[in-house]
Amino acid sequence: MRILNMNEYIGLNHYLILSSLVFTIGMLGLFMHRKNIINILMSIELMLLAVNINFVAFSVYMQELSGQIFSIIILTIAAAETSIGLAILLIYFRNKGSIEVTDINQMRG
């Protein structure tokens, strides 16, 4: 029985193309949905995911674990950042009733 090595079929170029597509989708989402703050946060998360795909792809290609470890650290920090951002948005929505970027821009102390 032959064990398949996926590195023979899926090369570094495939991961880089996937990463660039995910980053482009995140960038387009950031530019096209500038009114809703939740869509902006999701687009930023997509862009961070694309960077993590790059780290993992180069880590596998170079046969080092540092890129994968760094990717896990970035995912942990991004999850904490997103949860804090969504908690702030939830409190703001309860007080003001809207989460549009134009309304948040006009916040005053």
Curated annotation (Swiss-Prot):
Q: Does the keyword Cell inner membrane apply?
A: yes
Q: Which gene encodes it?
A: nuoK
GO CC, alphabetical: NADH dehydrogenase complex; plasma membrane
Which is an annotated Pfam family here? Oxidored_q2
Q: What does this protein do?
A: NDH-1 shuttles electrons from NADH, via FMN and iron-sulfur (Fe-S) centers, to quinones in the respiratory chain. The immediate electron acceptor for the enzyme in this species is believed to be ubiquinone. Couples the redox reaction to proton translocation (for every two electrons transferred, four hydrogen ions are translocated across the cytoplasmic membrane), and thus conserves the redox energy in a proton gradient.
Tell me the protein's name. NADH-quinone oxidoreductase subunit K
Q: State how it assembles.
A: NDH-1 is composed of 14 different subunits. Subunits NuoA, H, J, K, L, M, N constitute the membrane sector of the complex.
Reaction catalyzed: a quinone + NADH + 5 H(+)(in) = a quinol + NAD(+) + 4 H(+)(out)
Note the coiled coil stretches, chain numbering. none
Residues that span the membrane, as ranges: 12-32, 40-60, 72-92
Q: Which GO terms describe its molecular function?
A: NADH:ubiquinone reductase (non-electrogenic) activity; quinone binding
Q: Which Gene3D superfamilies match?
A: 1.10.287.3510
